Amino acid sequence: MAQLTPMMQQYVETKEQYKDCILFYRLGDFYEMFFEDALVASKELEITLTGKNCGQEERAPMCGIPYHAAEGYISKLIGKGYKVAICEQVEDPKLAKGIVKREVIRIVTPGTNLNTQTLDETRNNYLMGIIFTDEHCGISTVDITTGDYYVTEVENNRKILDEIYKYTPSEIVCNPEFFHCGLDVEDLKNRYQIAVSTFEDWYYDSEQSVKTLKEHFKVGSLDGLGLKDYSVGVNAAGAILKYLYNTQKNSLSHLTHITPYVTSRYMVIDSSSRRNLELTETLREKQKRGSLLWVLDKTKTAMGARMLRSFVEQPLITMDEISARYDAISELNDNVITREEIREYLNYIYDLERLMGKISYKSANPRDLIAFASSLSMLPHIKYLLSTCESALLKQIHEEMDALDDLQNLIDRSIAEEPPIGIKEGGIIKEGFHTEVDTLRKAKTEGKVWLAELEAKEKEQTGIKNLKVKYNRVFGYYLEVTNSYANLVPENWIRKQTLSNAERYTTPELKELEDKILNAEDRLFSLEYDLFAEIRDQIAEEVKRIQKTAKAVANIDAFASLAYVAERNQFIRPELNTNGTIDIKEGRHPVVEQMIPNDMFVSNDTYLDNAEKRISIITGPNMAGKSTYMRQTALIVLMAQVGSFVPASYANIGIVDRIFTRVGASDDLASGQSTFMVEMTEVANILRNATKNSLLILDEIGRGTSTFDGLSIAWAVIEHISNTSMLGAKTLFATHYHELTELEGKISGVNNYCIAVKEQGEDIVFLRKIIGGGADKSYGIQVAKLAGVPNSVLVRAREIVDQLSENDIAEKARHIVSAAEISNLTPETEGEVNTNKMYTTKVNATEVITTEVNTAKMNTTEMVSNQESVEQPRNFGQMSFFITEDTKQKKASSEFSEKLVQEINQFDLANMTPVEALLKLDKLQKKIRSHT
């Protein structure tokens, strides 16, 4: 086999060290990829695949991209889940002896992408490190574009997920044990597009982690960083820092502090609730428009947008912190002119955090510094406007905001007003800042003038009237004197060449000019680059001041946005309490009211407490507004704890520790779960993790299964929640099981509410108003009419409902099948009916007994013949859980049936739970089998 060429050998050796990356190998003005990397990159980037002689018998697959366009291509690969290793030329090819020296200068991963052009400026790009142990889990999260760095510890899988969903990192790096902690890691990768990889063994060594953190923060003990009680968290923080050093190959000087926190400081919102409440994006379109953040975010800066997003994603549970935010918003609304002036200045501030990150990474260009200085020029105005504020948070922002006028002055003096993007092309340094730059720049542009002046001066001094300053590539610049004036040549001139009719000379002054003119451009570009790098480094040394100021700007922007939205949307300042009462008057959905015209949104009251108003059972037809009402209540509570004003005429909010929602029903095809399985998984999570201080929003529990099972589950869930020794949480419970309305008065704390509906003949009008009492109709056919269901279907539905509304549901269902079979059907549906696949279903013996006891129509022989799993017509009506008086009074067709009815009559249904009812039915079934 032929030998590889020296260059290709260098490539192969480098690639061997970065097997999990696509290697961008710098060759002149291009980054080239070879072999397998070329095959992958050409496909993913849609670029031409070629070949290159590599010294072997076959040409190596090759593709390439221009170096100046690399960031866009890198971001594409990162977005597709790849890692990219950037291998640069680290010596001047002109000076290289042999193969140019190359090194990997950075590894780009989803969590370490520095390309601010492709990152969403309104959200952080987090990298998360997770160390899982049997007792605790350490979690550290960092955004290297802003310098944010956090650490915490949690106890169980659910809390790990809560932190993941809160930060939504682009990348997770973990220890191998994390893959065995019971979480669906593949789901994180596939559904949430989070890149997940493991640390190497040495990364999560605890001693190494402590050492890494101490060295980075230059401290002798981690206690001063607040990390004393975070042993596993320190492990995660150190591991993620080592990972960054290894991939970024940079000092990471902008990671100036680490923030430890306890998760109990914030309200817990699980992933389902975040999606269902549409906090930052809509459920279907995954867009910001239509979310709560869309309503609240009227920030002017990228920093403010990220800060406000963090407010929404991490509601507070401490009254003092929340009240402080209210005070800031109140003051900004009391001083509208001040607020709007601040917002106007904020409009001209660039992303200081990410600009600072680029400066620290030495990737900032001259235009970045101009944007930075332009932003700093706004700070004195904002600081002055804040100087008169009295609320605690606004005073704190004023104190923490540094005008940074020294840095602004440095940039204004040194950097040209309209510099190029490149840093090695000159034109960066402002005239008058550096004498040598001015001289070189003058030499580059005024060299001919200097030569003409020298020529005139020498002519005058020597009397050589035909003296000329000339140039050629061999001798450079020289003074040419004809032989007729040779006697006038000064002794200090140096002869360079003798011609037949002339002599050529040089002088020290001409040599100096020659040096300036010929080397001016190269020296100028090099000097300007050095000066720019020096200025950039000077700014980087002030990273702590800049980051502190950037956070102050972000906070005032977020509060000004909340104040502006509160005023524009007529939000009010809520009151807070610790007794658990939620009292909302004329509450409105903050998003829906913005989506409908002319103030048509109907407001509603809500009252929940820890005593007799714990659970509200809400009934009413679909489309009437049950889900909107429940979501609006949850959002008002959440907004109150975010520190925002709320859409209501009055609100007194008891602090809740968690908000859980079970809203909607859909199959989770990605993870192979059915509608009902998704529903029950979420219900199980709620019942296990909610506390008496939680707020539960439950919509249509049990609708994903059969009527009887669904009703039983819904009933049992309400019993569990209402029991103060088990849970006792405040709950809004929407249902179509109207039988559940009978729980009011039977279970403590349960109250009935419904959506008011106005009937107009066969039509209905949804009044959208919550009123006391339970609904007596579902208005399903009327809703179907509103949805545009064909009239023929509606007519047939009315016929069926009239039949099913009578007590003999099971018997009538048989006739419905027959009626359907003889109706006008399409050939396709006709075939389904003829094979009994449309209107029949398997039911078990318990369902058969339940149905037939209710109707008291089937004799003993029929019961016995149907006690095993059999084909039965599907019951299209809502099966009644309660045995009617009419059923009890009917006579059985046999002596055994009569005894059965007598026994049923003795049931104390009013005090019987669903589980007890099922046990009774099981006992009856055994009697029937025994009798046969």
Swiss-Prot record:
InterPro entries xref list: DNA_mismatch_repair_MutS, DNA_mismatch_repair_MutS-lik_N, DNA_mismatch_repair_MutS/MSH, DNA_mismatch_repair_MutS_C, DNA_mismatch_repair_MutS_clamp, DNA_mismatch_repair_MutS_core, DNA_mismatch_repair_MutS_N, DNA_mismatch_repair_MutS_sf
A GO molecular function held by the record: damaged DNA binding
Organism from which the protein derives: Lachnoclostridium phytofermentans (strain ATCC 700394 / DSM 18823 / ISDg)
Key word Glycoprotein present: no
Keywords, ordered alphabetically: ATP-binding, DNA damage, DNA repair, DNA-binding, Nucleotide-binding
GO biological process: mismatch repair
Tagged with keyword Translocase: no
Positions of ATP binding: G620, P621, N622, M623, A624, G625, K626, S627
One Gene Ontology cellular component: cytosol
Entries under SMART domains matching the protein: MUTSac (SM00534), MUTSd (SM00533)
Source superkingdom: Bacteria
Similarity comment text for this entry: Belongs to the DNA mismatch repair MutS family.
Cited PROSITE patterns: DNA_MISMATCH_REPAIR_2
Function: This protein is involved in the repair of mismatches in DNA. It is possible that it carries out the mismatch recognition step. This protein has a weak ATPase activity.
Name of this chain's protein: DNA mismatch repair protein MutS
